[in-house]
Amino acid sequence: MAIHLYKTSTPSTRNGAVDSQVKSNPRNNLIHGQHHCGKGRNARGIITAGHRGGGHKRLYRKIDFRRNEKDTSGRIVTIEYDPNRNAYICLIHYGDGEKRYILHPRGAIIGDTIVSGTEVPISMGNALPLTDMPLGTAIHNIEITLGKGGQLARAAGAVAKLIAKEGKSATLRLPSGEVRLISKNCSATVGQVGNVGVNQKSLGRAGSKCWLGKRPVVRGVVMNPVDHPHGGGEGRAPIGRKKPTTPWGYPALGRRSRKRNKYSDSLILRRRK
């Protein structure tokens, strides 16, 4: 990832650091429009996810998370920007004429060849079942349910590690630090997701943040009591509670939000950090 630092000419470019290498040129048969959702609101119009709204219109790129083009090699033709995720995507031309988008593996360049199947080489970008991978393999785009497509380790720079195989299950260490069991028949892609330096980017101004659909973040302590439990008081007053809370009065900062008695509790050997 090439980070471009602006030459300071205006206040908005003083602290900007953006990626100037990857562009977007989507294929018409691999994109479709998407409805602009309710800006963080639910069906009743109540805010359930804060600081969302506005943003530029986006076209959704159809990503091949299943990698079910078995035993057919494909060639990386382009590496493109995707506005719907922080990872890059690359266009694959398969030998049978099929064209698909996949997540860009770290280190992959235009012209590289990838393949998916049961007996394929353990090389970057190849997709195969966990049972055919050696221990210690770095993987991403991991299936939870067989045939459903990859659901884990899909963000930019994400990578998981295969640490054990026993019986019908494989043990993985996920990017969050969680250690859990997954069926050995599930597939994954070898390597790490690209765009590792995404956290080095600095938009430099509020307007660029708004283009991404992210609204300003306001502290609860400066609100009125009707808007937040921390609000109110004369001047710079404390929050008036023993512990911080969310805008809806639930404990914040450390409260576990995972639902109890989920079916996957028995599959998690060590919870996330």
Swiss-Prot record:
One of its GO terms (cellular component) is chloroplast. Its main location: plastid. InterPro entries: NA-bd_OB-fold, Rib_uL2_dom2, Ribosomal_uL2, Ribosomal_uL2_bac/org-type, Ribosomal_uL2_C, Ribosomal_uL2_CS, Ribosomal_uL2_dom3, Ribosomal_uL2_RNA-bd_dom. Residues 1-27, 224-273 are annotated as: Disordered. Keywords: Chloroplast, Plastid, Ribonucleoprotein, Ribosomal protein. GO terms for biological process: mitochondrial translation. The keyword Ligase does not apply. It is found in: Plastid, Chloroplast. One of its GO terms (molecular function) is rRNA binding. The keyword Chloroplast applies. It holds the Pfam family Ribosomal_L2_C. Part of the 50S ribosomal subunit. Belongs to the universal ribosomal protein uL2 family. This is Large ribosomal subunit protein uL2cy. It comes from Liriodendron tulipifera (Tuliptree). The lineage of its organism: Eukaryota, Viridiplantae, Streptophyta, Embryophyta, Tracheophyta.
